[in-house]
Amino acid sequence: MLELPIISISIFLPLISVLYILLFISQSKKADKAIYVMYVAVLSSVLTFISTIYILIEFDSSNPAYQFIERYAWLDKIGLEFHVGVDGISIFFVALTSFLTLICIIGSLFTVKKYIKEYLVCFLLMESFCIGAFTSVNLLLFYLFFEAILVPMYIIIGVWGGENRIYAALKFFLYTFFGSVFFLLSLIYIYSKIHNFDLTYIPELTGNIPLFTQQILWWAIFIAFAVKIPIIPFHTWLPDAHVQAPTSGSVILAGILLKFGGYGFLRVLLPLFSSVSQEFAIYVIYLSVIAIIYASLVALAQKDMKKMIAYSSIAHMGYVTIGIFSFTEAGVSGAIFQMLSHGVISSCLFLIVGTLYERLHTKEIAKYGGVASKMPVLATFFMIAMLGSVGLPGTSGFIGEFLSLLGIYKVNVIATFIAALGIILGAVYMLKLYKEVMLGEITNKEIMHFRDLYKYEIISIAPLILLIIYFGLMPSSILNVFRLSVESLLVKF
């Protein structure tokens, strides 16, 4: 049986679609070019999603090594190969990328009013680059995809964002690019000593690098991924980016891009510098605890819905980093689960805020109230997403936070109790948000004319709601897939 290069298909199908749109549809003289662009974008995202689901179905969870490996020579002089594969850690992020991209593209067909062709092209490019980064086994290839993601996201915020979109886009780009410079310099040094970028090979050799140099490299790479998560004090770009980004941009930003921080720690930092990671872990843990409490308190004071959810993301990603740097199976498994759960819950919340914004054209909490009486379906969806965000048992949010706290409890009891306070604060600000937006009397007359969710909005939000419940009730179906990969990662710890 001929084996398909299924990962290459997942990476390059969106790129080929972009080329087709730009080279053929754009040159067409037909008046309905935009319709053809929409068809191509939807078909491409559907096929890419199917290909990633095929990978997920065929994946052998009893094998912790990379699977579906493809390896082709490229630029041997600098150690660059097209070397891709998936393991238990990366496979769900690949599926999440294609799933959220499909949701964003479908929703965009009904909400984007200008430059729809360019908008869809940006999302297809981002899908390709994200899948490429999550599947890269060559460290330099990972860096190239990791950096390429910046460009379409910058354009999405800068062109289709809100009133202060240029400022937010520049801030996003400069922060992320700043961190990536340190990453690039580290790669150059590593290659000068090891002459290899194979992620299955170089972890065995980085121990030969002098300890002080390892420490410098560790901090350089840590900063690159800390900006992505983001960890305080590298977080200030995120609230601005979320507030100004269009709804679909916020979905991709929260659902996928923030995950590269935690994924980078798991894929690059811990394997390459295991001993130094143990040495500096306590600092990361306390930074994460500070981030959880600080972001939760700031979220509590917000008057803008998207900014509140943005700060809640910083708090939730804090549980990811404490789980990772606990170096326990429970903690790391919880961190991966938390990233997946947050990707689903935060995406759902941003879509819900987007539906409200489409009707009232404001994200200010005080302008709402009593929406549930006019939009009961949305109110139900919002309730489930909100309960997932606060970590109610039976939802996906509970599993990740519980395992992360269980992992860190074995290492640092004080940090565990402080981090647990973040869960209480999270419940306070999310319940407050729901109460002020959905419940009470209708004080804004425009809300009287609201109609409940349109079909395309239900199609976008309902699958995420189902995943929040499924992940919460059947967590073992997710945890078992990456259990052996986590055990393999933690051998050095």
Swiss-Prot record:
Function of the molecule: NDH-1 shuttles electrons from NADH, via FMN and iron-sulfur (Fe-S) centers, to quinones in the respiratory chain. Couples the redox reaction to proton translocation (for every two electrons transferred, four hydrogen ions are translocated across the cytoplasmic membrane), and thus conserves the redox energy in a proton gradient.
Protein family: Belongs to the complex I subunit 4 family.
Catalytic activity: a quinone + NADH + 5 H(+)(in) = a quinol + NAD(+) + 4 H(+)(out)
Gene it is expressed from: nuoM
GO MF assignments: NADH dehydrogenase (ubiquinone) activity; ubiquinone binding
Keywords assigned by UniProt, alphabetized: Cell membrane, Membrane, NAD, Quinone, Translocase, Transmembrane, Transmembrane helix
Assigned EC number: 7.1.1.-
PANTHER family named in the record: NADH-UBIQUINONE OXIDOREDUCTASE CHAIN 4
GO biological process: ATP synthesis coupled electron transport; electron transport coupled proton transport
Name of protein: NADH-quinone oxidoreductase subunit M
